[in-house]
UniProtKB/Swiss-Prot annotation:
Subcellular location: Cytoplasm
Family: Belongs to the class-I aminoacyl-tRNA synthetase family.
Lineage: Bacteria, Pseudomonadati, Pseudomonadota, Gammaproteobacteria, Moraxellales
GO process annotations (BP): leucyl-tRNA aminoacylation
CDD domains in alphabetical order: Anticodon_Ia_Leu_BEm, LeuRS_core
Residues annotated to bind ATP: 639
Family matches, as HAMAP family: Leu_tRNA_synth_B (MF_00049_B)
Organism: Acinetobacter baumannii (strain SDF)
Catalytic reactions of this protein: tRNA(Leu) + L-leucine + ATP = L-leucyl-tRNA(Leu) + AMP + diphosphate
Keyword vocabulary terms for this entry: Aminoacyl-tRNA synthetase, ATP-binding, Cytoplasm, Ligase, Nucleotide-binding, Protein biosynthesis
Protein's recorded name: Leucine--tRNA ligase
């Protein structure tokens, strides 16, 4: 073969565009809907087209690309697609701010970000690209909605929302700031409006059970989070008979997982929206005002534990089901109507929220559990202690039930109350049905029609998709679809009368719950996914994304897979066989603080740093004025802290390969990555050294390729061993461990070994050549542009290259290094045959000149640790 010559210096911004153009021209990464042989589907969570890539994107997509390129080298056909999660509130907000249609803003962002992603050098099949805001995509979302509605898996009910009376619009919880609308500043009201819900609770047990099938492929942390979110509990429904039958005949039913504490109930609390609360407020203006206050300031479930406890007595009473004692009914803001029956039996002695409430309103506290290892005399009704909430213990102050432990008490109360119709055992889930209606414009239209005669009617399938008008510029005052009769005026498909099209749109989590399936056949016009493509590519073999999506997105995608499975669209029960959750990208923060406490954050790119000899930052100045700023430590890159590093700037300065290598080397993928300019420079230096190694080798012009294994010098044996050990390690690190950082470390070691090696004959040259081409092939998943360019000099096309095979014979050692100690201190080293005898080893150890000078007295002991060391005790 002919050896080429290359520029002695690495010029990333010259080679990367030409390599990318080559991939595009040859459609290297295009795959068919169905393929023969080994194949694999690698997917990173698709981005929202916010306008610019951030470093979190770079990390996510580089991880996916490293895995994809690795399996391509292993001879597999790999599907790695890309698309855009394109509906959503940020586009509406940007449209309002810039007076531009969300569609225009979104597609301009997509064009820019697509260009950025291509510059990263991703091995993506761009022919499969789609945006979820196109009718070709959401047509099939609407089709599935219609099927599910007909099966009863979607229903409509009233739901409480945040209403901005000035902007005349519904606000998401995060758009409410201190009780006011984020844009108008108006006091937010609570309103009840009809919304559509998915019956995800019908699948709660299946969603829980099938987590067991993901045990080997998903992080334990994510499985635990999903289990907790689904929240299966076995408890008891207990009815407290009414003591005011003339007002409320039915009694009050509660659900509890702590039936063992029943004898400690001192009051019952209901949610503000509970029918009993509303009944009690009919002739009580003060109570009615309190209920309204609770409605306006409703607390999210996540904040319940820390929110201030508010309550008011209803004046009504219920009877304790065992003792008949009358217990007051209170309205409490920590009870949610959406959980259980909207009522709780309060046991202040053994529940922290009840304890806090009882102390605030001077309600009785009665201890009924004597926790194991706790002194009964230690119980204090004024200061909560951790053991008060323990299930481990025996009942006290509970009459005939004294001495029983948790399960025995549960069984005893059930046996006593069930025959009276006052209790039954019940399994309950924390998971709530999924409300998907959004009073927003920029989303998928809900394919429903409201008819005064026929009620809610699905849009006929031959009229799908219901297309969202795209030439709309929202002004922030409500959903513009409500002002567009050309959109909402329609005829009822059932009776033919005038009807109104639904103007709510779907939660954008719906689009991202099935997109992975659409990639298998994105141009298919006969359904969600072509059956043979679904059979070929699904489920996704490896899914990659941030751990912040551990609950909602992943749960909804699992739910949708089961819905599609039950519709016969896909096979199998789970969408993602393996999941890798990457950590956050952190960067230094810098700020100044005004007298009023307001902080102004400065981007690291505009900061001049002074470091100590260990590289730690000791002072920082803003380059705009030369004045000092406060060093805030490392935090997640974010707009709020202004500490994002623009990936484009890194690519422009160093090249995509440097950005990729840094991202993969700086930390294990599941841990936080600390941004470091020095680390980026280090990655770039590494690639420059690889380039120079190849340039130097090519310069010598020796084209020897055949290795004569029987006649290798010791140095050549060592380099071959290093080469094949590296193949073994990199393969294991990428495939099994996802330890990309240690894979790169191994490549750095192979580079060092290759640099030190001096070829003395053709056999040595062939060994060196093997080491270099192996290094380039193993580096290819991380730095594909550099690898493709350099491998071409050896006559290899990276796109057709295969992962090197390990030569087991290269791993065997004929010699070994033995450490020689005198009295436990290192005094010398020996290179000896692996089958040397003990006597010969001792003789050679004693003969070492650097050892002999310490052998001054008689030798008391000779210690030999096989294959490792000799220790002579004198």
């Amino acid at each position: 073969m002919t050896i080429s010559h290359i520029d002695p210096e690495y010029q990333a911004n010259t080679i990367e565009p030409s390599v990318q153009q080559d991939w595009e021209n040859r459609k290297v990464f295009k795959v068919a809907d169905t393929v023969e042989g080994k194949h694999r589907y690698i997917l990173s969570m698709f981005p929202y087209p916010s306008g610019k890539l951030h470093m979190g994107h770079v990390r996510n997509y580089t991880i996916g690309d490293v895995i994809s390129r690795f399996y391509r080298l292993k001879g597999e056909t790999v599907l790695q697609p890309m698309g855009w999660d394109a509906f959503g509130l940020p586009a509406e907000n940007a449209a309002i701010a810039h007076k531009v249609a969300p569609a225009k803003w979104t597609f301009e962002n997509i064009a820019y970000m697509r260009d950025q992603l291509k510059k990263l050098g991703l091995s993506v099949d761009w022919d499969r690209e789609f945006a979820t805001c196109t009718p070709e995509y959401y047509h099939w979302e609407q089709w599935l909605f219609v099927q599910l509605y007909k099966k009863g898996l979607i229903y409509r009910k009233l739901s409480t929302v945040n209403w901005d009376p000035v902007d005349q619009t519904v606000l998401a919880n995060e758009q409410v700031e201190n009780g006011r609308g984020w844009r108008s500043g108006a006091l937010v009201e609570k309103r009840d409006i009809p919304m559509y819900y998915f019956r995800i609770t019908d699948y709660a047990q299946e969603l829980l059970d099938d987590l067991d099938t993901l045990q080997d492929g998903w992080p334990q942390q994510v499985l635990t989070m999903q289990r907790n979110w689904i929240g299966r509990s076995t408890g008891m429904e207990i009815t407290f008979p009414s003591a005011n039958t003339e007002i409320y005949a039915d009694g009050l039913t509660v659900y509890t997982t702590r039936a063992d504490t029943l004898m400690g109930v001192t009051y019952v609390a209901v949610a503000a929206e509970h029918p009993l609360a509303l009944k009690a407020a009919e002739n009580n203006p003060e109570l009615a005002a309190f209920i309204e206050e609770c409605r306006i300031g409703s607390v999210a479930e996540a904040d319940l534990a820390t929110a201030e406890k508010k309550g008011m007595a209803t004046g009504l009473f219920v009877k304790h089901p065992v003792t008949g004692e009358e217990l007051p009914v209170w309205i409490a803001n920590y009870v949610l109507m959406s959980y259980g029956s909207g009522a709780v039996m309060a046991v202040p002695a053994h529940d922290e929220r009840d304890f806090e409430f009882a102390n605030k309103f001077n309600l009785p506290i009665k201890q009924v559990i004597d926790a194991k290892g706790a002194d009964d005399a230690d119980y204090s009704a004024t200061e909560w202690q951790e053991w008060y909430g323990s299930k481990e213990g025996k009942l006290v102050n509970s009459g005939e039930f004294d001495g029983l432990e948790f399960q025995a008490a549960f069984d005893a109360f059930l046996a006593k109350l069930e025959p009276q119709g006052l209790a039954n055992s019940k399994v309950q889930f924390r998971l709530r049905d999924w409300g998907v209606s959004r009073q927003r414009y920029w989303g998928c239209p809900i394919p429903m029609i409201n008819c005064d005669t026929c009620g809610q009617v699905t849009v006929p399938e031959d009229q799908l998709p219901v297309v969202l008008p795209t030439d709309v510029v929202p002004d922030g005052s409500g959903n513009p679809l409500n002002k567009m009769p050309e959109f909402y005026e329609t005829k009822c498909p059932c009776c033919g009368g005038d009807a109104r099209r639904e103007t709510d749109t779907l939660d954008t989590f719906v689009e991202s719950s099935w997109y992975y399936a659409r990639y298998a056949s994105p141009d298919f016009t006969g359904g969600i996914v072509k059956p043979e493509a679904a059979k070929n590519w699904l489920p996704v073999n490896q899914y990659i994304g941030g751990v912040e999506h551990a609950i909602l997105h992943l749960l909804y995608a699992r739910f949708f897979h089961k819905l599609m499975h039950d519709e016969g669209v896909v096979q199998g029960n789970e969408p993602f066989t393996n999941l890798l959750t990457q950590g956050m990208v952190l960067a230094d923060t810098f700020y100044r603080e005004a007298e009023n406490g307001k902080k102004t954050w400065f981007n690291p790119a505009n900061i001049e740093l002074e470091r100590d000899e260990k590289g730690r930052i000791i002072s920082a100045k803003y380059s705009g004025d030369g004045q000092e700023v406060i060093i805030g430590g490392q935090e997640k890159m974010s707009k709020s802290k202004n500490n994002g590093i623009d990936p484009q700037a890194i690519i422009d300065q160093y090249g995509a390969d440097t950005a990729r290598v840094f991202m993969m080397f700086a930390a294990p993928p599941d841990q936080s990555l600390e941004w470091s300019d020095a680390g980026v420079e280090g990655a770039n230096r590494f690639l420059k050294r690889v380039w120079r190694l190849v340039a130097s080798f090519l310069e010598k012009g020796n084209s020897a390729t055949a290795i004569d294994k029987a006649n290798l010098s010791k140095d050549a044996q060592d380099l071959r061993r290093k080469t094949h050990e590296t193949i073994q390690k990199v393969s294991d690190d990428i495939e099994r461990r996802h330890a990309f950082n240690t894979a790169i470390a191994a490549l750095m070691e192979l580079l060092n070994a290759s640099n030190k090696f001096e070829a003395k004959d053709d056999n040595d040259v062939a060994v060196e050549r093997e080491a270099i081409t192996t290094l380039l092939t193993l580096l290819a998943p991380f730095a594909p542009h550099l690898s493709q360019t350099l491998l071409a000099q050896f006559g290899t096309d990276l796109t057709e290259a295969t992962f090197p095979e390990v030569d087991a014979s290269a791993l065997t050692r004929n010699t070994q290094t033995i450490v020689v100690q005198v009295n436990g201190k290192l005094r010398g080293k020996l290179e000896v045959s692996v089958d040397i005898s003990k006597d010969e080893l001792l003789a050679q150890a004693k003969a070492l000149p650097e050892v002999q000078q310490f052998l001054t007295g008689p030798t008391k002991k000779e210690i030999v640790v096989p294959n490792k060391l000799v220790n002579l005790v004198v």
